[in-house]
Amino acid sequence: MHRILNVLLVIGTLSTAGARAAGAPPAPHLPRPDHVVVVFEENRAYTHIIGNMAAPYINTLANRGALFSRSFGVAHPSQPNYLAFFSGSTQNITDNGCPYRFNGPNLASLLFAAGFTFATYSEDLPAPGFAGCRNLHYERKHNPAVNWQGVNVPASANLPFTHFPDDFSRLPTVSFVVPNQENDMHNGAAPDTILRGDQWLRTKLDAYVRWADTHNSLLIVTWDEDDGSAGNHVATLFVGPMVRQGVYARRIDHYSVLRTLLDLYGLPLLGKSADAATIDYVWNPPAAKAAGPR
């Protein structure tokens, strides 16, 4: 019976997402990373970060990877941006309220249905599967997957950051890293809060970044929203061995990045990601395979 219910859950997930078969091969010009790590920072405009001496590590990453100079959040305040990135919809949420609960398809449910894996690693989460609204400097509004927990996202995918593996080959296919509000640039005034967030990222993830250089792994760093302006201009950057270094001026938003993740893994499209263009212009060509014996 449990097996039948699991099959029905997968069918339901796929039937309410786009029509593409789950796990289909990516387009020939797209890579398929073994791992993607997405780091969410908070409430800073593009001009607050790029070129700012208070963010030396992030600017180093931007210079070695793909920097999107016209990247935008999709709403204010924070929570609808996280929901949009995770599910292709703000779910009609216009505040940072807690708790909310949703039952439609999302990035994690599609990954699981196609045989891939997903986890969120949140700083100050007190225990795996914690569904409370806050703990210390953790806020549920920054952890979108928990809003589907127990529906189509298992509690085992909702983890404290202390569970981020030291053996990076054990990372899930896609993971979200959520610093607490002291370390994601949310709390405090610039430049101190920016410097603190930059230092946290270097301290906690530079070992992964250096490992990813020689492995098929992709880091994405983005901001949920800017400081509340109508423009909502934020920084987004991709870093990894498959990424072609440069500054890219095509307009993107959270739906564009979600669309790209779905396309990398051949997953059905979600909500407004179907109307977004895939980011298909920042990738190194695949390495040519050596010719075999004749």
Q: Where in this protein do the model-derived segments appear?
A:
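Bacterial N-terminal signal peptides
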Residues: 6-16
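Positively charged n-region of N-terminal signal peptides that target proteins for export
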Residues: 1-4
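N-terminal pro-sequences and low-complexity stem/linker regions of secreted or lumenal proteins
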Residues: 21-294
